[in-house]
Design a protein with these regions (language model features):
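Active-site-adjacent structural elements in enzyme catalytic cores
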Residues: 1-316
Length: 316
């Protein structure tokens, strides 16, 4: 723990230097901020887990500048992989593929697969291009809590757990999409949707045909039943259900049922604002079960999971 503030910069070259020296860098992406380490430095990768208080068996996602580099770390030779990578990268899509031998067990949690993607944020694209290799990066927050979409969120969550002599926050402004990447397992036939995200399942299906829902044990980031959780109790209200009889000064309402793009962009900031308001209950108006609404429903359901769901007529 430290009282000296962590350094903040908008210079990708400075971030590359930190990574090459074995430090951690909080990076902006189009989805959320990630906490990155050079994938070839196991001690640095281990610090990701301790900084986040993340279980060591929970796999990380590798981020690279382009497909050619991605193929050094994962088997992306299948037609499915090539179609998705060439169409959706850079962008909010993670492919779960067979790992290459040089990928460390600490990155994959000992699994034979690895998640990999090409982020679209311009600052992180510059960082990755200059770095020339690969970085491992989960979200830059304490494990299981609300994801960060601004540099200030990172400071609030893990600023005191970073080393000002070794680490850095790369400030790229607010994240554009606001929810994590879609994860597709391309090792199965048909491919499986492991986590809905910034690219809809409908879009994926248009590209590669049928995509199954996830089955079997958790094998990628974001698959735990409880995740993205605020401190405040949550209640999820489906379209058409009545709101509970609770005075307005005791609740914080998050409307995810209307403009889905805006709802995704604002979701984690709204959950943080609700916690800061110290209300007794967050009421989330649920989006439709399609498009970006599927990702929003996933995040909201997991955010409320450890509190019970209850109907619209009870606090749960």
């Amino acid at each position: 723990m430290t009282t000296r503030p962590i350094g903040i910069s908008s210079d990708p070259s400075r971030a590359v230097e930190v990574l090459r020296n074995g430090g951690l860098v909080a990076i902006p992406t189009e989805t959320v901020y990630g906490l990155a380490a050079d994938v070839t430095m196991p001690e640095a990768v281990e610090r990701i887990f301790s900084t986040k208080d993340r279980p060591t068996g929970h796999p990380l996602i590798i981020h690279v500048a382009h497909l050619e580099i991605a193929e050094r770390w994962a088997d992306l030779s299948s037609p499915t992989a090539q179609i998705l990578a060439t169409t959706c990268w850079p962008g909010p899509l993670t492919l779960l593929a067979k790992r290459r031998p040089q990928v460390s067990d600490i990155v994959t949690g000992g699994r034979p697969t690895v998640g990999i993607r090409v982020p679209a944020h311009p600052l992180t694209q510059q960082l990755l291009a200059e770095h020339g290799g690969a970085i491992a990066a989960p979200s830059a927050n304490r494990f299981g809590k609300v994801s960060p979409t601004t540099a200030q969120h990172v400071i609030d969550d893990i600023g005191n757990h970073l080393d000002p002599d070794r680490d850095l926050i790369l400030d790229g402004g607010p994240c554009g999409v606001g929810v994590e990447s879609t994860i597709i397992d391309i090792t199965t036939n048909p491919a499986q949707l492991l986590r809905p995200g910034g690219i809809s399942a409908e879009t994926i299906s248009e590209l590669i045909g049928d995509v199954d829902e996830a089955s079997g044990p958790s094998r990628a980031a974001g698959m735990m039943a409880s995740h993205y959780a605020p401190r405040t109790k949550m209640m999820l209200v489906e379209p058409g259900d009545p709101l509970p009889d609770t005075s307005s000064d005791e609740v914080y309402i998050i409307d995810c049922a209307q403009d889905l793009v805006k709802a995704a962009h604002d979701l984690y900031s709204e959950l943080r604002a609700a916690d800061a308001a110290e209300v007794s209950l967050i009421i989330a108006l649920m989006p439709p079960k399609e498009g970006l609404g599927t990702a929003l429903r996933d995040r909201l359901t997991k955010a409320a999971a450890d509190q019970g769901r209850g109907s619209a007529n009870q606090v749960g």
